[in-house]
């Protein structure tokens, strides 16, 4: 069964922040383009970084109050909506890395919501794991085959 998560991009750090749906009633609200979201309070984030929650495949930083720096999740149809169809996400992330005009933060949030999480949650198919790296910290995984360094199979 797929974990249900809130998804929000933090434009100041250029990272994708995730929150387990069960945490919406805890912690302080976090305002953003998608409305008001909740971030877990310190008491809602256990010392083991949520290992007991069985949110399969999420990096350790997914449970930090700042949100994760990399997102690993199970997606449908071998990621055809994000990788194979039009190569949209790698191009967008590459442009953002170079500081060039690219998809806006709001559009990128909608892209994840509509193209990725819709397939993942509604279809429930579990074929491959992918990691999307929008920012950087010691948890990120960048070992993708050429030509794209913005995602990797796990």
Curated annotation (Swiss-Prot):
A fraction may be phosphorylated in insect cells and HepG2 cells, a human hepatoblastoma cell line. Phosphorylated in vitro by host protein kinase C or mitogen-activated protein kinase. N-acetylated in insect cells. The keyword Ion transport does not apply. One of its GO terms (cellular component) is host cell nucleus. InterPro entries: Transactivation_prot_X (IPR000236). It is found in: Host cytoplasm; Host nucleus; Host mitochondrion. Keywords: Activation of host NF-kappa-B by virus, Activator, Apoptosis, Host cytoplasm, Host G2/M cell cycle arrest by virus, Host mitochondrion, Host nucleus, Host-virus interaction, Modulation of host cell cycle by virus, Transcription, Transcription regulation. One of its GO terms (biological process) is symbiont-mediated arrest of host cell cycle during G2/M transition. Residues 68-117 are annotated as: Mitochondrial targeting sequence. Its main location: host cell. The keyword Transcription regulation applies. It comes from the Viruses. Multifunctional protein that plays a role in silencing host antiviral defenses and promoting viral transcription. Does not seem to be essential for HBV infection. May be directly involved in development of cirrhosis and liver cancer (hepatocellular carcinoma). Most of cytosolic activities involve modulation of cytosolic calcium. The effect on apoptosis is controversial depending on the cell types in which the studies have been conducted. May induce apoptosis by localizing in mitochondria and causing loss of mitochondrial membrane potential. HAMAP family: HBV_X. May form homodimer. May interact with host CEBPA, CFLAR, CREB1, DDB1, E4F1, HBXIP, HSPD1/HSP60, NFKBIA, POLR2E and SMAD4. Interacts with host SMC5-SMC6 complex and induces its degradation. Interacts with host TRPC4AP; leading to prevent ubiquitination of TRPC4AP. Interacts with host PLSCR1; this interaction promotes ubiquitination and degradation of HBx and impairs HBx-mediated cell proliferation. Belongs to the orthohepadnavirus protein X family. This is Protein X. It comes from Hepatitis B virus genotype A2 subtype adw (isolate Japan/Nishioka/1983) (HBV-A). The gene is X.
